[in-house]
């Protein structure tokens, strides 16, 4: 919104022209979300404590987690608020890509909020019934997928970008909708599964968002898009603002979520952030890149699938406990060691993912 205001004021003072620069708005978007998150943190934590919105801990989990019982949860509210306010302030409100991400972010946030509410208020450890959770996730994802397909049909916006091959970009047609659905819903649940230790999910989210900020900038710049042999998408540049807002809000939240955590994001945060990352990947046509950069989320999800599949088929477990971060805890790794090592792996994967853009 401030961009539009600056455009009207620039005739009176040329300095307002700085608001038209994407790099400037990206920086202030990050800082706005960061400071909002830091400002909201103590207030949200205090309010959650007053309302007794404490974390529900499974009795069959690692013993070290029993001390987390009662820690305020649903802190994702401050992440979502910080991102939304920052994006509305610094992004062009006419950009359809921005609204797609915000729609998924808020929509999945509401689904996560209902799930958390049932857990912490109604003391229902299962939360929102799984089929209803997936139903609403699917509805939200399909609305965005069909909307973007209708707008970008038979254009580079619905092509499949294959890593390492610059000349292979098949037109997906209606398969675009199916791919978008699985990426958005899958990423949302993958981040949700990863959110099991203090700060474990938020830092890889920050790394991936930072990586996508660079990709969005290149995709929205015709010269760099042609240089990297990726589709040029004129609306993609504004996703830089969304990505930097996620980075800022994530870092602000980490201030309170780092070990030992003062607050957890809950499903209201993890489902929303995962859905937002999935949507950004789809809009940028970088679903394969998300698999690489979000490798930590992928491995966490695969560990659960393999664990459940192995137990049902063979009656045996592959890991001591799934998701895999619990496996390392039960092997005797201190929680901070698991967290930081997963962060390091995540950073490496993001750098590898960015490098693949040039290897074609």
UniProtKB/Swiss-Prot annotation:
<keyword id="KW-0472">Membrane</keyword>
<feature type="transmembrane region" description="Helical">
    <location>
        <begin position="199"/>
        <end position="219"/>
    </location>
</feature>
<dbReference type="GO" id="GO:0008360">
    <property type="term" value="P:regulation of cell shape"/>
</dbReference>
<keyword id="KW-0133">Cell shape</keyword>
<protein>
    <recommendedName>
        <fullName>Phospho-N-acetylmuramoyl-pentapeptide-transferase</fullName>
        <ecNumber>2.7.8.13</ecNumber>
    </recommendedName>
</protein>
<dbReference type="GO" id="GO:0051992">
    <property type="term" value="F:UDP-N-acetylmuramoyl-L-alanyl-D-glutamyl-meso-2,6-diaminopimelyl-D-alanyl-D-alanine:undecaprenyl-phosphate transferase activity"/>
</dbReference>
<keyword id="KW-0131">Cell cycle</keyword>
<keyword id="KW-1003">Cell membrane</keyword>
<keyword id="KW-0573">Peptidoglycan synthesis</keyword>
<keyword id="KW-0460">Magnesium</keyword>
<dbReference type="GO" id="GO:0051301">
    <property type="term" value="P:cell division"/>
</dbReference>
<dbReference type="Pfam" id="PF00953">
    <property type="entry name" value="Glycos_transf_4"/>
</dbReference>
<comment type="similarity">
    <text>Belongs to the glycosyltransferase 4 family. MraY subfamily.</text>
</comment>
<keyword id="KW-0961">Cell wall biogenesis/degradation</keyword>
<dbReference type="GO" id="GO:0009252">
    <property type="term" value="P:peptidoglycan biosynthetic process"/>
</dbReference>
<keyword id="KW-0132">Cell division</keyword>
<dbReference type="GO" id="GO:0008963">
    <property type="term" value="F:phospho-N-acetylmuramoyl-pentapeptide-transferase activity"/>
</dbReference>
<dbReference type="GO" id="GO:0071555">
    <property type="term" value="P:cell wall organization"/>
</dbReference>
<comment type="function">
    <text>Catalyzes the initial step of the lipid cycle reactions in the biosynthesis of the cell wall peptidoglycan: transfers peptidoglycan precursor phospho-MurNAc-pentapeptide from UDP-MurNAc-pentapeptide onto the lipid carrier undecaprenyl phosphate, yielding undecaprenyl-pyrophosphoryl-MurNAc-pentapeptide, known as lipid I.</text>
</comment>
<dbReference type="InterPro" id="IPR003524">
    <property type="entry name" value="PNAcMuramoyl-5peptid_Trfase"/>
</dbReference>
<feature type="transmembrane region" description="Helical">
    <location>
        <begin position="236"/>
        <end position="256"/>
    </location>
</feature>
<feature type="transmembrane region" description="Helical">
    <location>
        <begin position="18"/>
        <end position="38"/>
    </location>
</feature>
<dbReference type="GO" id="GO:0046872">
    <property type="term" value="F:metal ion binding"/>
</dbReference>
<dbReference type="Pfam" id="PF10555">
    <property type="entry name" value="MraY_sig1"/>
</dbReference>
<dbReference type="InterPro" id="IPR018480">
    <property type="entry name" value="PNAcMuramoyl-5peptid_Trfase_CS"/>
</dbReference>
<feature type="transmembrane region" description="Helical">
    <location>
        <begin position="72"/>
        <end position="92"/>
    </location>
</feature>
<feature type="transmembrane region" description="Helical">
    <location>
        <begin position="94"/>
        <end position="114"/>
    </location>
</feature>
<feature type="transmembrane region" description="Helical">
    <location>
        <begin position="168"/>
        <end position="188"/>
    </location>
</feature>
<dbReference type="InterPro" id="IPR000715">
    <property type="entry name" value="Glycosyl_transferase_4"/>
</dbReference>
<keyword id="KW-0997">Cell inner membrane</keyword>
<comment type="pathway">
    <text>Cell wall biogenesis; peptidoglycan biosynthesis.</text>
</comment>
<keyword id="KW-0812">Transmembrane</keyword>
<keyword id="KW-0808">Transferase</keyword>
<keyword id="KW-0479">Metal-binding</keyword>
<keyword id="KW-1133">Transmembrane helix</keyword>
<feature type="transmembrane region" description="Helical">
    <location>
        <begin position="288"/>
        <end position="308"/>
    </location>
</feature>
<feature type="transmembrane region" description="Helical">
    <location>
        <begin position="132"/>
        <end position="152"/>
    </location>
</feature>
<feature type="transmembrane region" description="Helical">
    <location>
        <begin position="338"/>
        <end position="358"/>
    </location>
</feature>
<dbReference type="GO" id="GO:0005886">
    <property type="term" value="C:plasma membrane"/>
</dbReference>
<feature type="transmembrane region" description="Helical">
    <location>
        <begin position="263"/>
        <end position="283"/>
    </location>
</feature>
């Amino acid at each position: 919104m401030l961009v539009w205001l600056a455009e009207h004021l620039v005739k009176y003072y040329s300095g307002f022209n700085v608001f038209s620069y994407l790099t400037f708005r990206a920086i202030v978007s990050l800082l706005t979300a960061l400071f909002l998150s830091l400002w909201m943190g103590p207030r949200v934590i205090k309010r959650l404590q007053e309302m007794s919105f404490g974390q529900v801990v499974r009795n069959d989990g690692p013993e070290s987690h029993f001390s987390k019982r009662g820690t305020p949860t649903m802190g994702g509210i401050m992440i979502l608020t910080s991102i939304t306010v920052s994006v509305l302030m610094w992004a062009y409100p006419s950009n359809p890509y921005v609204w797609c991400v915000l729609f998924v972010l808020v929509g999945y946030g509401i689904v996560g909020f209902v799930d958390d509410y049932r857990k912490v208020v109604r003391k229902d450890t299962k939360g929102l019934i799984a089929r209803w959770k997936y139903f609403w996730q699917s509805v939200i994802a399909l609305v965005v997928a069909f909307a973007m397909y209708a707008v970008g049909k038979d254009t580079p916006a619905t092509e499949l970008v294959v890593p390492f091959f610059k000349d292979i970009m098949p037109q997906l047609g209606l398969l675009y909708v199916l791919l978008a659905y699985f990426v958005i819903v899958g990423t949302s649940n993958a981040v949700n599964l990863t959110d099991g230790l203090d700060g474990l999910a938020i830092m890889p989210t920050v790394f991936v968002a930072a990586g996508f900020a660079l990709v969005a900038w290149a995709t929205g710049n015709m010269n760099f898009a042609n240089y990297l042999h990726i589709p040029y998408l004129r609306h993609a540049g504004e996703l830089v603002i969304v990505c930097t807002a996620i980075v800022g809000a994530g870092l602000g939240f980490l201030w309170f979520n780092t070990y030992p955590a003062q607050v957890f994001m809950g499903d209201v945060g993890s489902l929303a952030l995962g859905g937002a990352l999935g949507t950004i990947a789809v809009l940028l046509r970088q679903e394969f890149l998300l698999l690489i950069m979000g490798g930590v989320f992928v491995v966490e999800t695969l560990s659960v699938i393999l664990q459940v599949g192995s137990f049902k088929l063979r009656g045996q477990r592959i890991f001591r406990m799934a998701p895999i971060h619990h496996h390392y805890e039960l092997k005797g790794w201190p929680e901070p060691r698991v967290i930081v090592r997963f962060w390091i792996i995540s950073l490496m994967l993001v750098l590898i993912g960015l490098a693949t853009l040039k290897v074609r």
